[in-house]
Amino acid sequence: MNFILLSASDAHKIVIQKLMQYYIYDFSEYIKYDVGDNGLFEPYPNLMDYWERDNNQFPYVIKMNDKYIGFVLVKLINSIERNYFSIAEFFILKKYRREGIGKAIAVKVFNLHKGHWEVYQINSNIPAQIFWNKVISEYTKGQFEERLEDGKKIQNFEN
């Protein structure tokens, strides 16, 4: 696996915008999105906010052999109970899945952001639930909690 996880610069905005169309297409299986009259899905809300300074949002692009293969959007959520990191979106093009890249990227992202984490998946996205449960279980050596809340499965842990 010869992949690179890069902090997404301004130059990567358009790359993530375009990859987001594939992500939304994949996700439309679980939440019924439709394309507009222009043949595209609606733009991801507030995507450009990830490049605002000091906003606790961290966009990443994933490259393999000099080709873009995905992205990760991480947020630091400031909560009354505690601050925590969350993976807002995680996407790898289908042809690169099931090769261990997703797990390796997730581990790299977790290691970049130390603290409390909450990773959630919608109830209907069973493949994502299986993926995240396995990755987080291995990463934490089983030291994580899982709960159902507001139609989502949530894993939380400290690293």
Identify the meaning behind each predicted range.
Residues 118-133, 137, 147-150, 158:
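Conserved beta-strand-loop-alpha-helix junction that forms the acyl-donor binding cleft
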Residues 82-94, 120:
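Conserved acetyl-CoA binding element of GNAT-fold acetyltransferases
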Residues 1-31:
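Conserved N-terminal entry element of GNAT/NAT acetyltransferase domains
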Residues 59-61, 67-76, 86:
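Conserved beta-strand in the GNAT
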Residues 142-144:
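Glycine-rich ATP-binding loops of the HATPase_c
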Residues 24-48:
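Conserved GNAT-fold acetyl-CoA-binding loop/helix
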Residues 45-61:
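A short helix-loop-beta-strand connector motif used in the catalytic cores of GNAT acetyltransferases and
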Residues 92, 98-111:
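Conserved acetyl-CoA-binding loop-helix of GNAT-fold acetyltransferases
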